[in-house]
């Protein structure tokens, strides 16, 4: 791979132009572009065709901050994660009214607690001798002479034998069975691109779910995918059992664990107990099968075909079909340009 020029944001246009010389009719798409089209055609029209200005998204602003701090860590700019950037962006969102969705639940408070836990417990992914961490590595996957997918990978771990691991950072909620199929398409894309463009063997693909943790307490059963905001409470039974096994006084056990739950931290526990509690960000692996690859190609090619069929359609034919909760709380064009409640689109 050392003999191959790597693609980053700084030279992506250059690589795209080289491909255009070979395939003059080729068009480039991103994974998010296809997802945008399939989620809401009206949103796609406003984003990529009419190019209306969107209002900022709290999840985009804060997610970008978390990604940036991880990028700095793996680029070697810092030795440990710095939460200051995230906190600054959180305060900016409050100041400028970039709000979380309205709900009877405390979405804002829960999000902040989950991400705070991530910053408190995050451990740098272990590296073997000779491993290289590459952040925001660009790629172009040529599908055919008219279509290609391009984008950037959060983190690639490159080994000496030209094999690699792919890691995608996620600040979203964990995936259910339906969502995991949709989310996995992105990992499949990364894997196929690394094989096609760089000739790498991809050993594993995974998500680091930043709002969730994995915990090993002593020799007890490992707990995976616990919300960061409540991980100590969810592991409290095991922690109490471990302390009991080490002959701690029952009254002290209750006091120690109650304090740990209140702080969502084990910093106040005795050293011999802390040493037997291993906590890290939840890393969820996905096994890429031939069936999954087939589904990826079918989804991708049909999405591109459907986009091209719509290109000459009038604005009103790009229909908004998502639910009202998404439109009101998550869409960047509501209510200035699109209001599903009134079933109208303001021509601005």
Segments (PLM) and residue ranges:
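RecB-family 4Fe-4S metal-dependent nuclease core
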Residues: 1-348
């Amino acid at each position: 791979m050392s003999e191959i020029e790597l693609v980053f944001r700084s030279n992506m246009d250059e690589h795209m132009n080289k491909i255009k010389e070979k395939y003059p009719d080729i068009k480039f798409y991103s994974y998010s572009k296809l997802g945008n089209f399939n989620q809401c055609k009206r949103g796609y029209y406003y984003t990529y065709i009419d190019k209306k200005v969107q209002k900022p998204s709290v999840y985009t602003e804060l997610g970008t901050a978390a990604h940036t701090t991880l990028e700095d860590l793996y680029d070697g700019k810092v030795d440990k994660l710095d939460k200051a950037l995230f906190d600054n962006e959180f305060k900016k969102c409050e100041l400028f009214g970039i709000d979380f969705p309205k709900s009877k639940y405390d979405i804002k408070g829960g999000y902040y607690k989950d991400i705070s836990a991530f910053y408190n417990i995050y451990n740098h992914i272990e590296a073997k001798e000779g491993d290289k961490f590459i952040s925001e590595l660009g790629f172009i996957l040529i599908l055919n002479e008219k279509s290609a997918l391009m984008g950037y990978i959060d983190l690639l771990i490159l080994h000496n034998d030209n094999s690699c691991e792919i890691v995608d950072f996620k600040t979203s909620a964990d995936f259910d069975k339906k969502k995991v199929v949709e989310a996995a398409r992105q990992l499949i894309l990364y894997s196929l691109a690394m094989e096609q463009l760089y000739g790498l063997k991809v050993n594993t693909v995974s998500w680091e779910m930043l709002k969730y943790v994995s915990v090993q307490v002593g020799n007890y059963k490992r707990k995976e995918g616990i919300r960061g905001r409540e991980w100590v409470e969810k592991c409290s039974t095991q922690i109490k059992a471990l302390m009991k096994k080490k002959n701690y006084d029952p009254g002290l056990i209750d006091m120690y664990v109650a304090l740990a739950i209140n702080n969502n931290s084990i910093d106040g526990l005795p050293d011999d107990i802390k040493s037997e509690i291993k906590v890290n960000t939840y890393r969820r692996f996905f096994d890429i099968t031939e069936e999954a690859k087939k589904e990826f190609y079918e989804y991708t090619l049909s999405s591109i075909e459907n986009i091209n069929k719509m290109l000459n359609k009038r604005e009103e034919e790009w229909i908004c079909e998502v639910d009202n909760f998404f439109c009101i709380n998550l869409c960047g064009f509501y209510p200035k340009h699109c209001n599903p409640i009134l079933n109208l689109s303001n021509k601005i």
